[in-house]
Amino acid sequence: MPDEAQPLTAAKPESASASAAKPAPSAPQAKNDTHGPIQHAPAAPVDKPAEQQPRPKPLPAERPQNAPVVRAPAGQPARSGSSNRVRARLARLGVQRANPYNPVLEPLLRIVRGNDPKIETSTLRQIERAYQVAERWHRGQKRKSGDPYITHPLAVTTILAELGMDPATLMAGLLHDTVEDTEYGLEDLRRDFGDVVTLLVDGVTKLDKVKFGEAAQAETVRKMVVAMAKDPRVLVIKLADRLHNMRTMRYLKREKQEKKARETLEIYAPLAHRLGMNTIKWELEDLAFAILYPKMYDEIVRLVAERAPKRDEYLAVVTDEVQQDLRAARIKATVTGRPKHYYSVYQKMIVRGRDFAEIYDLVGIRVLVDTVRDCYAALGTVHARWNPVPGRFKDYIAMPKFNMYQSLHTTVIGPGGKPVELQIRTFDMHRRAEYGIAAHWKYKQEAVAGASKVRTDAPKSSGKSKDDHLNDMAWLRQLLDWQKETEDPGEFLESLRFDLSRNEVFVFTPKGDVIALPAGATPVDFAYAVHTEVGHRTIGARVNGRLVPLESTLDNGDLVEVFTSKAAGAGPSRDWLGFVKSPRARNKIRAWFSKERRDEAIEQGKDAIVRAMRKQNLPIQRILTGDSLVTLAHEMRYSDISALYAAIGEGHVSAPNIVQKLVQALGGEEAATEEIDESVPPSRGRGRKRRANADPGVVVKGVEDVWVKLARCCTPVPGDPIIGFVTRGSGVSVHRSDCVNVDSLSREPERILEVEWAPTQSSVFLVAIQVEALDRSRLLSDVTRVLSDQHVNILSAAVQTSRDRVATSRFTFEMGDPKHLGHVLKAVRGVEGVYDVYRVTSARRPS
């Protein structure tokens, strides 16, 4: 591992010039990445020829090329002492005026100076040189937005500066895409900027080549850490890179946006959490949430904005009372409200199963103090005013979290009997909680600069130096141990399982590779994780050198070896299905047995469907040959109808359940039964009289006094394109032109009639709507009340709630004027928690 304190190797001016002499790419290139225009970075500079770019500041021994030569008057001896010092200062000032910093870098350099007021000018010049090299080699490259590509590395570096990262990391941020996207190589980089910057850029370049996704396994993580994260700053740069990409995602196609957002939510946000970088984590989560679930996101944003004024008023009262108590106790503290993050609110609704109001109305405040002693003193002061809620106190100072997060958590019954959450910690703890591992370099720079704002957990009288305090940071030592323990990936993965769930175990293969398995996994799960054939042929196992039964439970760090059979007929046992834990093993075992009897299972499944349909007098032939079953199979994620039949035959899905779904797709039991008549050829001489007071609002062109009815499968309303179909004994059934049943009906074109809308005051139409909302108590009651207020007659209502606390409701009601439907939908959308509402029809999906 390179020493972080190692000074940067400054390249000589002629070396940088030699680098500039290399031919830069001539043709403009549009990178296929997630980059769009930056939001917080300055505009890209105007391109300059290499020879016009500012020169690095000359060494003290050099005379600047354009600096004035100060000479003593003739006949007088040269003055010394203060006069010479004044002249030298003026000469240096002339150099600075002659070589100002690139104005594009001023916002970045302002942040850098704020982090370290005593930073040397030579270091700032090195950062400027890194920008010059990056701008030169990215010249001509464009982002998806059309902006110069250099705007991206500049924005990434600004994020790194805001985190307080050191100059080497800032230079690596500016140069992080040069090696991958240009002809500027690692040797050029090492010559111009030294080993540390080269190591960081190389690590980020390799990290970019790791492909994450559904197939990402624990060994991929191990390789990433061993080969690419020899220095933790590599991961910090990558997080800043991903954050800027997420901020500028709008120029990509929707499909790619969702892919990147899902990857961010599953990998990068948890990685930031593991590194303790909560500010990055929260923003990544909210950005990904907005892309993946835009309607839910918008609804939570609306709810937050709606409740913010009242919540802020209550928060001000609580904050003021806490400040008064702490002031009376002579505890110097900063008391602020804790922000609520949209994805965090959504997650709490899912995990805790609570309504939005419960979560958002729970006020949280943060108390920051100087020392650990003050933390506990502040806790006592708060508990003296308000009663604590039993079981809600947590001491993360004495027992830090896995990422060394430290704080005191408590919940009290505040003013008005409302619960209030408090976090009490020192300023240093807060910086680590916000910036995580990045806080190490910020702390280090402040310590070196002797900044007065640096606070320590120990009293000033303790006599400890700043270096001692750095050594006391157990959280930092634990995280930096990655670099020393890469040969032991199991231990690393225990502290950095960012892309896998918590309920897992990590075991080793005989070759030292890491396999991630569900908690409670067995050697059989391990065998199938290695390879399907290894799993099928497994006959025994050895764990940590000891023979064990195949159903034994594996623990973290176990070394697992399995024995396989070479016999031609070797295969899995059905008994394994009783103890395997991984979906992969279970699916592979079932697939092995399913292969032998798939045809048999398909026939059994089809027979089961037919029997279930007969019980409900459904049109078997039409449904089995139509699109309804195909659509249902795809919705249930089966590749085709045969796969659905096989699943039914093998007992994975029940036939009555499938038939019920089909009936719902056709518009309900009545509509499905109605279709039986439509599938039978018409016979003359039979008919029914039209029902009185039931004007459908449709007439058949060229035909009078014929019974017309609106199909319940697609519930057409005036304005919808429609067709008529002659049924036996039921007159003409009117369907939407895009109804899923039209394809099967059109096989008999002689029975298709032209119809048109002619609604009257007595016409009544069926409308079905679907309401999607964040689940809460009284949701159904509130929606039905709004529908009643809109004077619609509700005929049926059904509600389902998913695991992620999304309530999906379907209402069928009668309306006299479908033009009023827009007002109805708008009113329902105004119900708290509702983020989408739309009319439901059985329209065919666009091909």
Swiss-Prot record:
Q: Tell me the gene name.
A: relA
Query: Is Ribosomal protein among the key words of this record?
Result: no
What sections of the protein cross the membrane? none
Q: Which family does it belong to?
A: Belongs to the RelA/SpoT family.
Record-level GO BP terms:
guanosine tetraphosphate biosynthetic process
Q: What is the lineage of its organism?
A: Bacteria, Bacillati, Actinomycetota, Actinomycetes, Kitasatosporales
Induction behaviour: By amino acid starvation. Activation through the binding of uncharged tRNA in the acceptor sites of translating ribosomes.
Task: Tell me the domain of life.
Answer: Bacteria
Q: Which UniProt keywords apply?
A: ATP-binding, GTP-binding, Kinase, Nucleotide-binding, Stress response, Transferase
| Region forming the signal peptide | none
Where is the TGS domain positioned along the sequence? 503-564
Q: What class of enzyme is it?
A: transferase
**Which chemical reaction does it catalyze?**
GTP + ATP = guanosine 3'-diphosphate 5'-triphosphate + AMP
Quote the function comment for this protein: In eubacteria ppGpp (guanosine 3'-diphosphate 5'-diphosphate) is a mediator of the stringent response that coordinates a variety of cellular activities in response to changes in nutritional abundance. This enzyme catalyzes the formation of pppGpp which is then hydrolyzed to form ppGpp. PppGpp could play an essential role in triggering antibiotic production under some nutritional conditions.
Q: What is its EC number?
A: 2.7.6.5
Bias class Low complexity marks the residues at 10-31
Which SMART domains does the record match to this protein? HDc, RelA_SpoT
Give one GO molecular function term.
GTP binding
**Which InterPro entries does the entry link to?**
ACT-like_dom_sf, ACT_dom, Beta-grasp_dom_sf, HD/PDEase_dom, HD_domain, NT_sf, RelA/Spo_fam, RelA/SpoT_AH_RIS
Q: Which residues form the HD domain?
A: 149-246
- Name the chain's protein: GTP pyrophosphokinase
Give the organism the record lists: Streptomyces coelicolor (strain ATCC BAA-471 / A3(2) / M145)
Q: Quote the SUPFAM superfamilies the UniProt record gives.
A: ACT-like, HD-domain/PDEase-like, Nucleotidyltransferase, TGS-like
Q: Domain (ACT): give its ranges.
A: 768-842
